Structures are given as structure tokens and as C-alpha cells.
């Protein structure tokens, strides 16, 4: 302000430069604009104010010419103190340039208001010749201007700038008048020197800073008198961003210099807002980042920041303002934006429409106000929802929406544990590719209690915070139409299968593994996969399974020198018998015999064969009745996928089959889809057939015409086929060098072969003795001798030496033909292969 008056004094003393505003670089209006950089109306106000100060002999005049302008500018502080003492502006320390410009503009406005003048008055005063304006006739000129303004009516009242001592109510000026003023300003400064600061069209700096300054001015009583304006002032004071949704330049400028501009923002409009406003109103996830909120003009750079923004109070208030500006627009009737709650993150990633049931009914203007929306996320404050959102509508939803979680093992268990303490879970839905989950509670109160709790307490999944709120789009999860009665039971069917990993490859029986789980409850079913060092044990109840998992989390489970990892299988929820009659009958039949089991007792070959005929893999002949019971249910064997689809009568019911994709969610919703865990993924080919199962379909097709005697020997053929499949699996693992990989490969691949060989000797020796006369000499093999190599013909040179029986490569011929061919695994596989050839030859003769 001091610089403005100093320049006015300079212009006063240099009469030759006073009227030529565009040519003189240090003229009256140009100098004021250079120091203030304000709109045209305030520039003319400063011009008139400077002229008033000069006429009233404020003690600032000095005889300076054009060359002395620089020294006059440096002495601005002295005259500034004089001005402050006269107009009681108060002494403030030196401010930054932008703050000083803004403060000087408002001080000039207050000075003019103290004289009862407006911007239009000063415009007319500036048109008077300077030689006709003297301190003597100035009061008469001002009175004449005021009388003329009174006669013309309120058209001269320009909001804050035109406020008189009587505090006339602000008048809404047509937009055309502002355009004229803008053009006048541009025309007045077209010839201005290039060194001067550029003129900004009606941009009065940051709205938040300007609003804070207005709150300190005497304009406060106007806002207190007018309730609506007070509410609008507080509304605009919360942010420093403008609207991009308005069409005209005047409306885009945000808050103007007074209540006039505030009221202009509430101008009613017809129709609906632009699509960008609608999308941001509904909280749709942006397609990319950074994203600019078209309602708040606020840039966001991530999903988390976007979620915090749309749940904040400032965004909510602007959504309410958008509804007031477009009274005819009903956001619930938008066909492309069916999100019911404009303040919640749009669940745009949900599967096909209608999966979770119809959205709740739309809310209308006639509903009663319900007060705070404190249960829909932090930052909402005490703001009422737009158009008085009914709390009853919130209560109708029973679906808890969980977002922003990270995937991991036992994801479903982790998610359900968040809400399980608050009530019964009736259904749930976990999306496959998107980190969103919906959990339906039995009652609305349970869902509301869970949401209220996590409003104040962070919800954690795998130790990372997640967002929990009540879904406003979906009231409940719809049951599938085809199987309404097959809905899973949370307590009895979900999560009953325990997954044991890092088991030893061999050296233990099935019963030894089962004894690990027996202390925690009754075992309903199990499957053991030695080649994959893992096992699945189904307990009778979920509580038993959870008890074992919880105990092993606190205290590590050690088995034969290995730390066994125990967790609840997320992949499989139960083990199902495809032929339940045989399996169940076998279980019931062996239960009574299990009690009378003696560790020293062994079964005769005939008894063991009756239980394991058709089994793909027999684990041990020394195991007791309990082992036989389980191996009869689900003997284990690695098979090819095509064979597994035909023959096994036991499978793991995988939740991976019920994964929710966006395209298939409608059909897969029944049992509460979840994301499978890769770590406990077990191929269906790992599941073996039942103990009393008939020969496999593949074997039956190959040997359909075999005689009864040949069918008795099918067990051996199956074992040989299993051997070949193991060889293929070993070959897939890559080429192995004899020095580095021979011991490990043979031991890992054939670790349980001694048991199988013993089993074979136990259950098949009598058959071999009976049928030895039918086996030609070329297919016979004597007893095993460690230092005598056999089957050397099967070791062939191929970039090394490859054993076709064991699927192993060797670079050294001596190691391959002597060391390897003298090994027990090689001998066992050769024996099985010769038995297979002999059986095929016999079948050909009989046919």
C-alpha cells in the first residue's frame, strides 16, 4: 500500500506524466498495478485512492522527476508509516510480496468504504481533469457522486467493493458487466511496458488464504448476519482448489472478492452435471493416476489417497453442493453409475450385475435428516449425507465390504476372522483377481457392529491394514439358484483339512503321521503324498483342525528330525469319496479291527491283497490295520492327469473350482468363492484310488479280454505303470550328473521303493511261485546281488549314458553300467519291468 501512495505522490509532482498512463512506465495507474498486480476494478480504486491522498495533503509529496523514481521507491517505508497512522490500518511487519499485494488491495477497499465510495465512484472520479480537482471542491464532487449513485438505485453496489457505510445488501451483478470491466482493464494496459508484472484476470490468489484474510476483516458481521453466507464462507475456507465443473470463466474463478461471487456458485442449473462430476460423485475408481477430482480440483496419486479423499469431509460437502446446483439430477437414476452411496469407493470391480442381489432403493429429497454418517469411514465428521441420506438405508445392508488386502496363505480364514467375533457369517464372496471381499452377516446389527469397531480400530490382514465398511450397493449375497440347499456350513465344512508340509520322503508309516493329529480330535479322512513331502488330514470338526493349527503355531511340530509346517488348507475344504459306499464301508469295517491291532502282528499276503487290490501305491507291508484302513481309502500315487480323471474314486474338493471371476461369478457364488493358495496346491493326479476299487478303466480297456488268472496279476502291471510314470517325472526334473546327483536322485525318487519291494514280496511271492513255469528264462531274474550289475543293455549311449528304466543320465560309462546297475533301485525297476513283459506275453498266448 505504501508503494502505491508513494507512486501516487510521484505522479502528482510530475504533471507531464500524470495523464498518459500507457506511455509512462511509472505513471499513476501503471505504478499501482506494478506493485499490487490486482484486477482492473481494484487498480482503479487504488488510482482514485491515491488521488484522494494527494488532494488531502497526506505529507507524501516530494519533488521527484522521472530519473528519481528509483530513490523514491526506496523511501516507501517512511510514507507507509504516515498512512498507517492516519487510516488506523495498524502496524504489521513486512510481508511477502504476494501477501503484501493482497493486503494492500483489501486495505484500499476498506479506505474507500470508509469514505462511502465504491469502485464505480472512483472510476468516475478518475475521469475528472486533475486541474479541476482541488482540496476545496473535492467534498462537493464526492457528494455529487454519492447522490448520483443513490438516484440510480442499487446498480452501483458491487458487493464488497461497493459496500457503503449503511452496509447495503450485496447485489448480483450480471456477468456481462464483469466482462466489460475485464475488457476495460485489458485495453487500459495494452501499451504497458514489458517489464511490468502481467495482469491476472480475476484470480485473487489462493482461496484458502483469501478466505482466512476475510475472516479477520470487519466483513465478518455480514457473514454472521446471513446464515447461508456464513455456511458458504466456511465451506470455501476449507480448500484451496477451484471447480472445473462450471462452464463460464466467471464461475471457474472460484470465490470472488465478496459474497456476490459466493452466491454465484449456487446458481441453479438444469439437467445433470458432466460425466466427470458424476463419476467423482459416485467415487468411481480412476482409470489412471494421477487423477484430478473434478469436484474438488484435487489431484490424487493412488487408490489409498483417492479413498481417503472421497471419504473426507471436504469432498462430501462439495458433493452436497453439486446436488444443490443441479436440483433436477438424481444420482441414483444414473444408468451408468448405479452406486448407491456417493461417498464410498465404487465397487466397479465386482462381478456381473445381480450377483449380490439388487441395489437398495434410491433415496429422495423428502426423507428426514438423520445426522452424522459416522459409520462409513473416517473423515466424515458431522456432515449429513447429500439429500439427507437415511440411516435406515444403511442398516438394511448386511454385507461387510473389505478392500485393499494383500493375498497370502489362508486368506479366507484371515478375512473371516475379522468379522466372525461380531456374529454368524451367513455367506461370503472373495474376488479372484481383485483384492475385494464381501462377507454377509446374519443380521444388520452384526454387520454394523463390525464396521463400527473397525472405524476406530485398524483391521489387519497378514499384518497389513485393510479398509472395512458397510456395502451400500449390496444388501446381501444372493444364493445360487441351482443348489440352494448345498450351502456350506462355516463351522462344519469350511476349513476342516489340515495341510502338513516338509514331511520326510520315507521311513515312516501312515499311522505315524496320523498320530500327529489324533490328540486334537477325530480324523475323518486323510491323504499322504510322500513324493511331495506333504499330507492332507481332514478332521471331523473345524474346531479340531483349528486347535491343531493354533497349537503348532505356538510350538513347532517336529517329525523325524524335520520341522513340519502345519496350516489350515485354503485349497481344499474337505476330502470327498467319489464312491462313498466302498470307502465308508471299509472305514466302518476296519474301525473295530483297529482296536485289536498289535504292532507285532502282520497280515497274511492274502488278507493284504484283498484290501489293496487295484491300489496304485502300497506304502508298507509292516503297517498295521490302521494303515491298511487309510491306504484302502485313498492310496497315493502320482498319475497322469488323463488317467486320474477316469479312475480315482477319491478327490479333494478344491475351492479353486469355485474361484470368482468377473465373467463366471454368477455360477460360482454358491459355496463362497475364495482365492486358492499356491503353496498347498495338490494336483488331482496325486490322489489315488480306493483300496477295493476295481481295476482302472485304462487297464480294463487294455486287458478287457484277459482271463481271470490274468486279472489277478493286474496289480503287478499297475505297479510297473506307476514305476514308468515315476521315471518320466524324474526325467522332467532335468539331466543329472553321476557324481553330483546320482545318490540324491536315486534316494529321493526311490526312497520308499524298499517298502514297496517288501510289500511286493509279501503279497505277490505266492503268485510268482505258482506261475514261474509260465515265465520264459529271458524274463527271469535271480536274487539281488549288490556287486553284480544287471540290465546293462538298458544303459544306452546318448550324449552320455541313459538308463531307460531309471530315467537317469551318466557321463561315465563305468559309473552307469557298474555302479548304477548294481544299485537296489535299478534292480527293483528291472524286476518289475521284466514281470510286466512276462505278463503281457502270457496274456497274448491266452488270447
Curated annotation (Swiss-Prot):
Acidic residues: bias regions: 653-665
Positions of modified residues (Phosphotyrosine): 158, 202, 219
Region listing for Disordered, in residue ranges: 146-174, 187-214, 342-394, 588-786
CDD domains registered for this protein in UniProt: RRM1_MATR3, RRM2_MATR3
Modified residues (N6-acetyllysine): 3, 522, 571, 836
Location of the motif Nuclear localization signal: 710-718
Any GO BP annotation: blastocyst formation
Record annotation: effect of changing residue 72 to T: In ALS21; uncertain significance
Positions bearing N-acetylserine: 2
Keyword Acetylation recorded: yes
Keywords: Acetylation, Amyotrophic lateral sclerosis, Disease variant, Immunity, Innate immunity, Isopeptide bond, Metal-binding, Neurodegeneration, Nucleus, Phosphoprotein, Repeat, RNA-binding, Ubl conjugation, Zinc, Zinc-finger
Disease: Amyotrophic lateral sclerosis 21: A neurodegenerative disorder affecting upper and lower motor neurons, resulting in muscle weakness and respiratory failure. Some patients may develop myopathic features or dementia.
Function, in words: May play a role in transcription or may interact with other nuclear matrix proteins to form the internal fibrogranular network. In association with the SFPQ-NONO heteromer may play a role in nuclear retention of defective RNAs. Plays a role in the regulation of DNA virus-mediated innate immune response by assembling into the HDP-RNP complex, a complex that serves as a platform for IRF3 phosphorylation and subsequent innate immune response activation through the cGAS-STING pathway.
Protein name: Matrin-3
Organism: Homo sapiens
